Amino acid sequence: MKIKPPALLGSFFGLATVEALGCLVYLLANPADQNNSVSRMAVVALLLVTMLLSAWLTGLSIGRRGWAEQITGRFIPTGTAWRPWAWIIMAAVFIILWLVACLPAYRLGSYALYFARLQPWLVWAMLASLQTLLVFLVTRSGIAWTDWKRMVQEEKTALFASLSVLALFLLFWLVVGVSRLGLTRDVFWDRTGVPLLNLQVVTALAVSLLAAGLGAVGAFRAGKLRPGKWLDVVIFLVIWAVAAIAWNFTPQTHSHFAPGPYPPNYEYYPYSDAMNYDLDAQYPLIGIDAGSKGHVIDKPLYSTFLVYLHAIAGEDITSVVSLQVVILAVFPALLYLLGKLLHSRPVGLLAAVLAIFKEINAIRGSLIIWTVSTPKMLMSEFPTAVGLALLCLLIFLWLRDTRRKPVYAMAAGGVLGLMTMVRNNPWFLLPVIILIAWFAYGRQWKRWLAASGLFFLVLLVAIAPWEWRNIRVRGTPFYFLITLEHTVWENRYLPALPTAVVPTGHPSGSNLPGAQSTPAVRSSTPNVTNHPVSGGGSLSRYGAVFFFVANNFSHNLIASALTLPTSLLENDLDHVVNGQGSASLWATGWNGRLSLEAIVLLLFELLLIALGVGYCWSRWKIAGLAPLLLNLAYMLALGLARTSGGRYIVPSDWVTYFYFGLGLVQVCRWVASLREPVGTGRQLNSVIQPAGETGRGQGRWRGGLAAMLVVFLVGLSLPLSSTFFSNPFLVETKSGVLQILAEDGLLDKLGYATQDIESFTSNPGSFIAYGRAFFPRYLDYKTDAYAKEIYNDLPKTTPHLVFEMIVPTAWNTIDLPMVSSPAYFPNAADVIVLGCKSAHYVDGLAVVILGQHPVIYLPSPKKLLSCPL
């Protein structure tokens, strides 16, 4: 049944009349000057004329049938007379009007006031162009209600699942609004995640649809997809290369984990947790297993990864970071494969482009959002994201057809085992994966037991070399329990228990000596000695724990959802994050309040996410929900660790825009199916042929054994890393270090008397060591406001040269007051330091940079050679 021309045009112009009236009311409701400016009155007149003209055309369309038929026949061709150019031109007009109408006023400079006056009419024009597109769609497809019913019937499972998921989203929204779960600040509480800009989403969709439109070669044409493995290999490599180039060419900015650049080398050296991980990697480079010296290697696989990066790129931190970016840029390529398998190549491309854009925002916005983790930081969150994407891919390949030999189960177990040595949170995924597999296998419980057993076996194979090393060094294989006990239990759980004795000190992510205490937010950490969280009330002991776990878990979900655009305005990253001041979603004290625009957009985005989830359930059942379920499990693991938001959600927040993109492409596919002329035989349910057909490549045992061998060799590289390098620091005693200075004629150049040196050597508070210096930073607190935000334990009164020094038994922070920055101080230089030990650092009295031409630096002013100072 087609819509008749009078009804079609009458509806079109009637809706245009209502839209013009709404824009006119909005303009008149806004405050203006007393006399109403000429420009304002001109726009009022323009909207009034537009409204009256639309109303007149509405009446004309309904009252004069012949005129309506003549207009539709001339300007809106249908059937075989339809040509795509009108649709393309109107689509371009709509995009241009949207770009103009939603342009922020600050981008227009002195013309901003005139633009603000004209904006209501531009909004009307944008809506009118969108209506025209819909009219072209309606007349092209013919709008047969039987087709709509058939589509609903064929997509019944997907639509029902989508509505169920959307209902759960809305229920969660209601619970958050009533209980304030996810909005009540806690100790390790980061801001909302790194946002995607709406122009980036539109660009990603355009790339995806352009790829879908390249049907001339048959690779992307709906319903005619071919396996095209080589095509996928090419696309995979192109995405990898584009991501590596884009991220490496995005300028790095000052951030908490990579502050700077500071003289003398003007590099973004790592700090806080990133510094700990890199210093852990420096010990194997001098042939020392740090664990044998009493250190706890917090992230063993990631630190070992840095060992080999340094072995290839040297100690130039820029080269190391660039090489890391090249490797981690595989992440969007993995999302492409996952999207292609779950749905289609356009979904994979959309997810990959969004991933590239999001990390560009993270790199550029590190100063704006502060506690982020990016591929350009020596942090463990983004490598975990790569591991989680690969894990989701393998689990889907495993569970989409449980009749296969479990080669993918073995590979997935190995990946999860390796992930546990990057961060501890993935341990929580183990029971969730086993449970997902149980649902996937159904009544085939013997197959489930066998596959789960192989999964767990390869997991053990992956971690076995490091467990063996820990038994030899620390007497226990459970390398993760030390971090859980000290970092999580003592610093995060005990303070929440009303009757517990709270340990002194601040939470720290490392047990290494000299490690800096770094709360997750820039603001002061709230006092939680007797109150689990602000607003927790008189909760019982277990109630307090339940509250902060649920609170952080909810905050993780909220922060992840809000990475999608919440405004139609084409703001830049700075204005998105900081444009609304204290009302910004990224403000430290954001109370959960959303604007009407944000609510509408968020509801639309949640609907698309629900459609993506619903489609995956209808097509793949539990296997299609693997990314979603692992995301929820990881978010809950963060809640159990009492961490949330910001950098903590980086490993899994990609799942949000992944399902969002899947739902968006699926809607576009449905719309594209309606563009087929009446009578051409639409196949609404087969417009997508997922590139995951079962058939060849059922998986063989040799593939599983190969996966086991690979993960074992990766795991073995951890304890072996320190055996590939020799220890240059064979002298560890104070007298031995002074002997080196004397032999090189440097002892006399220090300017201290012999008896003073002898007395200083016997002083128990003295520090005389031969080691390697890293990350030299000259901090001038008068000229650099950000300098005060790092090294909180150092005095902030005078400029300092600060660097880290590792020796075979420990690493220390060296502080040397200096009037000006040294001209020469290379990173990873061998040095001899004389100083006085304090609680958190060494107060330097002399620093000697060794080499062919040794350089001596003394404090300004020069101090007596005695301790304490």
Which stretches of residues belong to each language-model region?
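Transmembrane-helix signature of polytopic, membrane-embedded enzymes
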Residues: L335-W370, V386, R403, W620-L629
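Membrane-interface alpha helices of multi-pass inner-membrane proteins
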Residues: L394, Y408-R423, I433-L435, V458-A462
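Perimembrane helix-loop-helix junctions
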Residues: L429-L460, W468
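Transmembrane-helix motifs of polytopic, lipid-linked glycan transferases
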Residues: S319-L350, L390, L607-G614
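Start-transfer (signal-anchor) and selected internal transmembrane alpha helices
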Residues: M1-G22, N36-L99, L113-S179, L183, ...
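Extracytoplasmic catalytic/substrate-binding loops of multi-pass membrane glycan-assembly enzymes
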Residues: F249-D280, A290-Y308, G314-T318, R474-F480
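Membrane-interface transmembrane helices that cradle and orient dolichyl/undecaprenyl
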Residues: P284, P383-Y408, A437
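Lumenal/periplasmic acceptor-binding loop at the mouth of the active site in multi-pass
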Residues: F257, Y262-Y266, D273, P495-L611
